Amino acid sequence: MTMQAQLGDKTFTLERFPLDQKNRSLQAWDSADEYLIDYVSEHHPDCRSLLILNDSFGALSCYFSHKQLTVCSVNDSYISHQAAAYNLAENKIPAITFSQLDSLSALPEQVDLVLIKVPRTLGFLQYQLSELSEVLAPGTPVIAAAKTKDVHNSTIKAFEQFIGETKTSLAVKKSRLIISHAQGGYKAADFPVNWPLEGTDFTISNHANVFSRDSLDIGARFFFNYLPETNKAKSIIDLGCGNGVVGLMALSRCPNANITFVDESYMAVESARLNVELNMEAKYEQCSFVENDCLSGFERDSVDMVLCNPPFHQAQAVTDHIAWQMFKEAKDTLKEGGELRIIGNRHLDYHDKLNRMFGNCKLLGSNKKFVVLSATKNTGML
């Protein structure tokens, strides 16, 4: 399908990342982006500096940078950062007044206007609004957008709590705006969250945008039963590490292994780093922490084992391309005889995917909801 996006008065070519994903029906912008652009053009034509939060693939960044505004884009996604930079370059938009920050960086204090694409996680929204409340001058407009089905009472209450008086717009193309103005005064959000990891002496620390932020998720709990308990694996990757509990437990059972924690979320990688530092400080030097698009750029044939709990969401879309990419790049990164060990929901049919890719797949365990699978890299079998 075409990737031509008519945004305001200009047509852009916008690509969704990763570029080689199989589902080309997913596009890099949505009606919420269009609504924000039209609203700002009509109601804030004199805006010169803009702070954008959660611009998934750079649609907003491209439009307002094209208009020669000073744009700072803040995101928790490494992939979103790559997409924005790529799309600006593809549309030949100079990035002279464009900058990007990760979700844990200090926000700029001098902006005319804030735009937010509402994230899936309420806790992450609360964290972002809290950070804004600390830096915005009173009266600064804050305008958010989301699909109408994703604007809940709790969403509105978060804006009222951290920013100020809030109203919503009429729906246009199934999207809605949330319009607020900073009232001044910092209002703290309780992040990171700390909780005890059951069955261990570990305390887990989670930043706001990390999955299952205040307890162990049931998938990881089941996966713990099938983690390696041998020093045979000298190098292990926790791929899509989240808060790092899987890699942390692997390190506790394989104390001589080098563990690499990889995620595309800056908050996830920082949570994993904190959790190793808090709970296994003596092993910290055996660990590395990497924000990345899966394992792209990793050395081929270099690791003994990859542990993975693949996600099946990207932004608001349900998709399996991330799992496919993880499996393919894990195979490339594994040494001959190396193992990919995963947990997944039963209905996702990962067994068939791994068989097709590796030429083998073994069921290690299952319950009503999950399966734990193992695939070994053996090029002679393919």
From Swiss-Prot:
It is an enzyme of class 2 (transferase). It comes from the Bacteria. Its main location: cytoplasm. It holds the Pfam family MTS. It is found in: Cytoplasm. InterPro entries: DNA_methylase_N6_adenine_CS, rRNA_m2G-MeTrfase_RlmG, RsmC/RlmG, SAM-dependent_MTases_sf, Small_mtfrase_dom. It catalyses: guanosine(1835) in 23S rRNA + S-adenosyl-L-methionine = N(2)-methylguanosine(1835) in 23S rRNA + S-adenosyl-L-homocysteine + H(+). The keyword Phosphoprotein does not apply. Keywords: Cytoplasm, Methyltransferase, rRNA processing, S-adenosyl-L-methionine, Transferase. One of its GO terms (molecular function) is 23S rRNA (guanine(1835)-N(2))-methyltransferase activity. Its EC number is 2.1.1.174. The keyword Ion transport does not apply. One of its GO terms (cellular component) is cytoplasm. HAMAP family: 23SrRNA_methyltr_G (MF_01859). Specifically methylates the guanine in position 1835 (m2G1835) of 23S rRNA. Belongs to the methyltransferase superfamily. RlmG family. This is Ribosomal RNA large subunit methyltransferase G. It comes from Pseudoalteromonas translucida (strain TAC 125). The lineage of its organism: Bacteria, Pseudomonadati, Pseudomonadota, Gammaproteobacteria, Alteromonadales. The gene is rlmG.
